[in-house]
Amino acid sequence: MTGWRIIFMGTPEFACPTLQTLLDRTENVVAVFTQPDRPKGRGQKLQPPPVKELALRHGIPVHQPPKVRTPEVIEQIRALQPDLIVVIAFGQILPKALLEIPPQGCVNVHASLLPRYRGAAPLNWCIVNGETETGVTTMLMDVGLDTGPMLLKKTTPIAPDEDIQSLHDRMSQLGAELLGETLDGLKTGRIVPEAQDDSQSCYAPLLKKEHGLIDWQKPAVTIHNQIRGLSAWPGAVTSLGGAPLKLYRSSIGQGAGTPGTIIATGKNGIEVACGHGSLIIHELQAAGSKKMDAASFLAGHPLALGTLLMPHEVTA
């Protein structure tokens, strides 16, 4: 196999379509670096990252250093003589010494329209903040957090009721397509890197459980966006009778009342008054139960009108 020697760095399912694109193009992927296996599930059994599984199926050597910034790992990467390193959702910050190894640089596939939504959770925060459009950017990495020169972008609309899982799946494919176009442009010299305008930047910090706490004093549209943006994790949560209640799917209503009060129930959902407007809950999950639609929930948990949903408190 000829062409640029490429090292791929990525970890979750989101990164797999991009690695698959490199394989489909018969690029010379000489190694894959990914996070160590992690314990998961009730049995806490070690589970390999999805990227590792894909790489091994194709016979690509896999490396899983806990930290890539150590001198030993940097020398290991140098010995592989990469022309280019492709990074997507890797989960570790690359040090300057590593970034300087490949002559063609390190290309990152970032799930936002940079310079907006730099950081760890751009897709979630785009939805939570009510954005109607997002996209993917390829960039040449520098030592900053998603601050390097931009190469190419692809945009995509966000539907008013789209949730994080749907957007995640679409964007993973979009990123893979853009990486292919970026490689073509770099190899032919057609791409001129563009500096980011830092004055237009905003950040998408790592998600915490606290981000899922619902405040019924807020407008219904704000809570609706919170639910669809955080449905995968940590989940939008309120409290019913002192127990946590996770909300997974909702729509916006026109009702009014004391914020947090249940003002209507039926097959269509459970309607709750908010600071402005109302929220109709269509899918939810009580503690110790399965996720279910509102009608199924009401069959086992009849709710009187006027019942108050309270703020939930996060426990360590």
UniProtKB/Swiss-Prot annotation:
Catalytic reaction equation(s): L-methionyl-tRNA(fMet) + (6R)-10-formyltetrahydrofolate = N-formyl-L-methionyl-tRNA(fMet) + (6S)-5,6,7,8-tetrahydrofolate + H(+)
GO MF annotation, one: methionyl-tRNA formyltransferase activity
Entry keyword rRNA processing: no
EC number: 2.1.2.9
Enzyme class at the top of the EC tree: transferase
Cellular component GO terms, alphabetical: cytosol
Signal sequence annotation: none
The UniProt record lists the keyword Plastid: no
Entry binding sites for (6S)-5,6,7,8-tetrahydrofolate: S112, L113, L114, P115
Keyword field: Protein biosynthesis, Transferase
Disulfide bridge partners, by residue number: none
Record InterPro entries: Fmt, Formyl_trans_C, Formyl_trans_C_sf, Formyl_transf_N, Formyl_transf_N_sf, Formyl_transferase-like_C_sf, GART_AS, Met-tRNA-FMT_C
Similarity comment: Belongs to the Fmt family.
NCBIfam families reported in the protein's UniProt record: fmt
Function: Attaches a formyl group to the free amino group of methionyl-tRNA(fMet). The formyl group appears to play a dual role in the initiator identity of N-formylmethionyl-tRNA by promoting its recognition by IF2 and preventing the misappropriation of this tRNA by the elongation apparatus.
Protein name: Methionyl-tRNA formyltransferase
Species per Swiss-Prot/TrEMBL record: Trichlorobacter lovleyi (strain ATCC BAA-1151 / DSM 17278 / SZ) (Geobacter lovleyi)
Record lineage: Bacteria, Pseudomonadati, Thermodesulfobacteriota, Desulfuromonadia, Geobacterales
Gene: fmt
